From Swiss-Prot:
The active site is at Y235 (proton donor). Involved in the final reduction of the elongation cycle of fatty acid synthesis (FAS II). Catalyzes the reduction of a carbon-carbon double bond in an enoyl moiety that is covalently linked to an acyl carrier protein (ACP). Belongs to the TER reductase family. NCBIfam families: EnoyACPredFabV, PRK13656.1. Its EC number is 1.3.1.9. It comes from Shewanella amazonensis (strain ATCC BAA-1098 / SB2B). Monomer. It holds the Pfam family Eno-Rase_FAD_bd. The record marks E75 as: Plays an important role in discriminating NADH against NADPH. This is Enoyl-[acyl-carrier-protein] reductase [NADH]. It catalyses: a 2,3-saturated acyl-[ACP] + NAD(+) = a (2E)-enoyl-[ACP] + NADH + H(+). NAD(+) binds at residues 48-53, 74-75, 111-112, 139-140, 244, 273-275. HAMAP family: FabV_reductase.
Length: 400
């Protein structure tokens, strides 16, 4: 079929398998160009490995460190009449390129929150790898099915205490609007912590530990974002922030547990990037368009892949084997460049000046849109989007 982009709200409902493969290859080539990650991990489990930071982590481990990887994700394959999700095609491409280089690659497609996914991952590790030395936790999901009761819990992208109003961009109409979001109820806050907090990360590590598959010195990392006062009302001081604070709580508990075997658990605070997850957060697209332009001008721009490579080589797996620098909460900070005073002051000064008319000139808004559509495999140079492509892409994946 011939596949063109169809955008609805903040998601693109179509995906291009060839474009998604090109994205993955671009990240692999970037990783190889950086050279090997000295002292990197060799047997890695990535929970949430099909897009964004999770996919980049799997690529860094495999193509930067020669690691065997197991990826867990929840994606839809394509059928003859309908494309699959971008994450499906990303994972298929990763598997293809990893196997071509003789790297071990196995994937599990199912609900990562379930007991079943954990049991299947443990079974694979025991059968094929024995133990693992790194666990990356990179889930972004709006809903969690509680594994014991089967209850569906939903997260909310809302402020706490009072309504939040701010200048934002309508990404469908490319116009500047005033966005208003009502505050979360106590129940919505609690539910957001249940879905996006650290509980499932702990459940994964506890299950892996009890099964005896965590190697001596095993490291685990989960990803977070803090941002600045420009996004705090909707993010860090909102319902999502409470969940991310719970991730910090889990990190301390897990770090105590893993320290006994010479390992560690950290939250890594990453920079804002264009992902399916961030595009759903009110105000983030406008903030990203502003901060990206300034960071590009300063030579500090990083996408998902560059961020993760810096986390591996300059934090967790330093060439000299020294311990990573952490903040007062034991977090790895990769948002350090974004949070530079000059970068943030620029955004603060610019925010009130933005209009629909000057949006393209004062920000990297259209670059943001191009990067967003690229997540789904579109707008990539050298790809013929009028060509017939097969939406059915099969690979070595265990379906739960």
């Amino acid at each position: 079929m011939i596949i063109k982009p169809k955008i609805r709200g903040f998601i693109c409902t179509t995906t291009h398998p060839v474009g998604c493969e090109a994205n993955v290859l671009e990240q692999i080539n970037l990783t190889k160009a950086r050279g090997p990650i000295v002292n990197g991990p060799k047997r890695v489990l990535v929970v949430g490995s099909s897009s964004g930071y999770g996919l980049s982590s799997r690529i860094a481990a495999a193509f930067g460190s020669g690691a065997a990887t197991i990826g867990v994700f929840f994606e839809k394959p394509g059928t003859e009449s309908k494309p699959g999700t971008a994450g499906w095609y990303n994972s298929a491409a990763f598997d293809k390129f990893a196997k071509a280089e003789g790297l071990y690659s196995k994937s599990i497609n199912g609900d990562a929150f379930s007991h079943e996914a954990k049991a299947k991952a443990i079974e694979l590790i025991k059968a094929d790898l024995g133990q693992i030395d790194m666990v990356v936790y990179s889930l972004a999901s709006p809903v969690r099915k509680l594994p014991d009761s089967g209850e569906l819990v939903r997260s909310s992208l809302k402020p706490i205490g009072q309504p939040y109003s701010s200048t934002a961009v309508d990404t469908n109409k490319d116009t500047i609007i005033e966005a208003s979001v009502e505050p979360a109820t106590e129940q919505e806050i609690a539910d957001t912590v249940t879905v996006m907090g650290g509980q499932d990360w702990e459940l994964w590590l506890n299950a892996l530990d009890e099964a005896g598959v965590l190697a001596e010195g095993c490291k685990t990392v989960a990803y977070s974002y803090i941002g600045t006062e420009l996004t705090w009302p909707i993010y860090w001081h909102g319902a999502l922030g409470k969940a991310k604070m719970d991730l910090d709580r889990a990190a301390h508990a897990l770090n105590d547990k893993l320290a006994a075997k010479g390992g560690s658990a950290n939250v890594a605070v990453l920079k804002s990037v264009v992902t399916q997850a961030s595009s759903a957060i009110p105000v983030m697209p406008l903030y990203i368009a502003m901060v990206f332009k300034k960071m590009r001008a300063e030579g500090l721009h990083e996408g998902c892949m560059e961020q993760i490579l810096r986390m591996f080589s300059e934090r967790l797996y330093k060439a000299d084997g020294s311990a990573p620098e952490v903040d007062e909460d034991n977090r790895l900070r990769l948002d350090d460049w974004e949070l530079r005073d000059d970068i943030q002051q620029h955004c603060r000064d610019l925010w009130p000046q933005i209009t629909t008319e000057n949006l393209p000139e004062l920000t990297d808004y259209f670059e943001y849109k191009a990067e967003f559509i690229k997540l789904f495999g579109f707008g990539i140079e050298g790809i013929d989007y009028d060509a017939d492509v097969n939406p059915e892409v099969n690979f070595d994946v265990i379906e739960l």
